[in-house]
Amino acid sequence: MTGKPSPWPLHREHTGETRTISSTVPPPPSYLIQILAALGLQSPRSFHRDPAFLLLVALGPMVWLAMTGFSALHPLPWQALRSPAFLSAALWQPLFEELLFRGIVQGYALQSRGMQKAWNGITLANLLTSLLFSSVHLTSHSIGWAFLIFVPALCFGFVRDRFGSVYPAIALHVFYNAGYFSLVGGT
């Protein structure tokens, strides 16, 4: 064969040339990482083994029983646990609410030094966010119901502050909603 180029050039992958793809992808800018961290969108330490988190999980059934005083008990049949209505109430609403309230609102409030002041683990940012969270529920619920919602809201904010992440708050909120709506969501 002569030194002429081949009339059928080989694809780069077949010529032995290599290049690393990761070197062409720039790392995320530090400001983006800071924004995500401020919103609580970062991986938390092992919250599922934390005694405070486990206590809040254990208190869930007591919260459900307290809240069922405002509703008749109508447990859902097992097949209804896959219904769009149940998935919305137990999964999608807690996800949206936690990203909005504990991620954006509480995350933004925590940027202020004064809002980081805490009493028994409850920051001022958590307290104000929980009040806002409860007041939003007043649009469709009674004052008594909003007060009952305020207590779990403080718990969700507490774990957001404790772990610096919204993921534990989302997990706890999903658990609370799933338990509650499985008790009262049936007809």
Predicted region positions:
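Compositionally biased non-globular segments, especially hydrophobic aliphatic-rich helices
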Residues: T18-I21, F147
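Transmembrane helix-loop-helix hairpins at the membrane interface
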Residues: L59-G69, P84-T187
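Juxtamembrane helix-loop-helix connectors linking adjacent transmembrane helices
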Residues: T2, P9, T20-S22, P26-P94, ...
